[in-house]
């Protein structure tokens, strides 16, 4: 499926080279998010390599048709200075651990720490254990028990596949009948393959949703500016959940106090908890939050840049991403500077998305667009 992401800038941005020493940077992943990451590194003057095929990146970097298993050997043979892992799957698979064992500098959490995204059940268990505010929930690996519990709840209600499902494993059911149907699809009919073998059933939260991403070095937390993405496929918050149909920053409805509450009651307690559990977190921790009438609550944790939030945030970032990544790895302090401009990104997806979409469609007119396209 061909997906085009384009980011409209409201003000003219002048890019400057933030790092005078050219380094070899390898970006794992080839989507819009990874294009934005590679673009940022290129603007800083670095030599770009990408694992995966991205025609736009191939114009200013080198795209590699190699497997995940071949990455360590390639890095050693080609003296790669930094590996930046974009997607969640390689992180959950433990790619960063393997690279570190080979003496290769890699940005991202360990396999154990990546469980925060790799398992909704694990994430919820950690939130419950350490009193991190979230929706009321129960988790199940037995369909009959899950169905019986669901029958006693009220709609709307949220069903979450335990494992990775490319951002589509969350179902907001408007009726219990729909919820029972989706539960059976997940647990009995393998709608999300093995990812739905276990599920989380949780209350539906109402409020203003926002994405709080932080650079994290063990117990040190460096919040980014916040962004908001739109997950539903259609206008007016309708349609199925997707990986994200657009994003913008900053947000007017979220205050500095809301952000501080998110950091102090959600992100900081979680990274402290991970460290205490022997799974120190290094990389990007994404907290999907909801500003409710009774305070900020946690919807989910991810262990990498949000997509499409990444595309707008990296255009807004006025600090060196290369320096940030290395300082996080080394446990050094990070200084984040941001442009004052506002940014909005719109995602164009193949017809039929997020269900089985059309493939091979030709996208025309890109040369007429005077704005970054990822």
Regions found by a protein language model. Name each.
Residues 19-111:
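ATP-binding N-terminal substructure of ATP-dependent carboxylate-amine bond-forming enzymes
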Residues 26-27, 118-198, 228, 252-268:
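Active-site nucleotide/adenylate-binding loops and adjacent lid/helix of ATP-dependent enzymes
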Residues 173-295, 299-308:
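Internal nucleotide-binding/catalytic subdomain
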Residues 100-110, 116-117, 123-130:
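Glycine/small-residue-rich loop that forms an oxyanion/phosphate-binding "nest" at active or ligand-binding sites
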Residues 8-10:
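Tryptophan (W) side chains
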Residues 262-285, 302-367:
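Active-site "cap" helix and flanking loop/linker of ATP-utilizing ligase/carboxylase catalytic domains
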């Amino acid at each position: 499926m061909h997906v085009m992401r384009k980011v409209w800038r409201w003000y003219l941005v002048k890019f400057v080279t933030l790092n005078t020493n050219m380094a070899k940077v390898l970006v794992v992943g080839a989507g819009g998010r990874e294009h934005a990451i590679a673009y940022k590194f290129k603007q800083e003057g670095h030599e770009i390599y990408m694992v995966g095929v991205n025609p736009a990146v191939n114009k200013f970097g080198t795209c590699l048709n190699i497997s995940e298993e071949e990455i360590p050997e390639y890095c050693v043979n080609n003296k790669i200075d930094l590996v930046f892992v974009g997607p969640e799957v390689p992180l959950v698979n433990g790619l960063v651990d393997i690279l570190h064992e080979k003496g290769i500098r890699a940005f991202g959490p360990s396999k154990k720490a990546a469980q925060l995204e790799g398992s909704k059940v694990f994430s919820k268990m950690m939130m419950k254990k350490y009193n991190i505010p979230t929706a009321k929930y129960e988790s199940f690996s037995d369909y009959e028990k899950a169905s019986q519990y669901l029958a006693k709840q009220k709609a709307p209600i949220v069903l979450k596949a335990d494992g990775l499902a490319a951002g589509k494993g969350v179902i907001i059911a408007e009726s219990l009948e729909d919820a029972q149907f989706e539960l059976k699809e997940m647990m009995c009919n393998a709608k999300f393959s093995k990812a739905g073998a276990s599920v989380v059933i949780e209350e539906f939260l109402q409020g203003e949703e926002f994405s709080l991403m932080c650079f994290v070095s063990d117990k040190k937390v460096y919040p980014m500016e916040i962004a908001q993405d739109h997950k539903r496929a259609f206008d007016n918050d309708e349609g199925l959940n997707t990986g994200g149909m657009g994003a913008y920053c900053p947000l007017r409805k979220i205050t500095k106090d809301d952000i501080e509450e998110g950091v102090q009651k959600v992100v900081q307690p979680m990274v402290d908890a991970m460290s205490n559990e022997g799974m120190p977190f290094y990389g990007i921790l994404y907290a999907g939050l909801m500003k409710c009438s009774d305070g900020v609550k946690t919807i989910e944790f991810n262990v990498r840049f949000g997509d499409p939030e990444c595309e707008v945030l990296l255009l807004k970032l006025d600090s060196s991403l290369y320096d940030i990544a290395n300082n996080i790895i080394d446990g050094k302090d990070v200084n984040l500077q941001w442009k004052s401009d506002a940014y909005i990104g719109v995602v164009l997806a193949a017809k039929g998305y997020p269900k089985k979409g059309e493939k091979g469609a030709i996208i025309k007119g890109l040369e007429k667009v005077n704005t970054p396209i990822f």
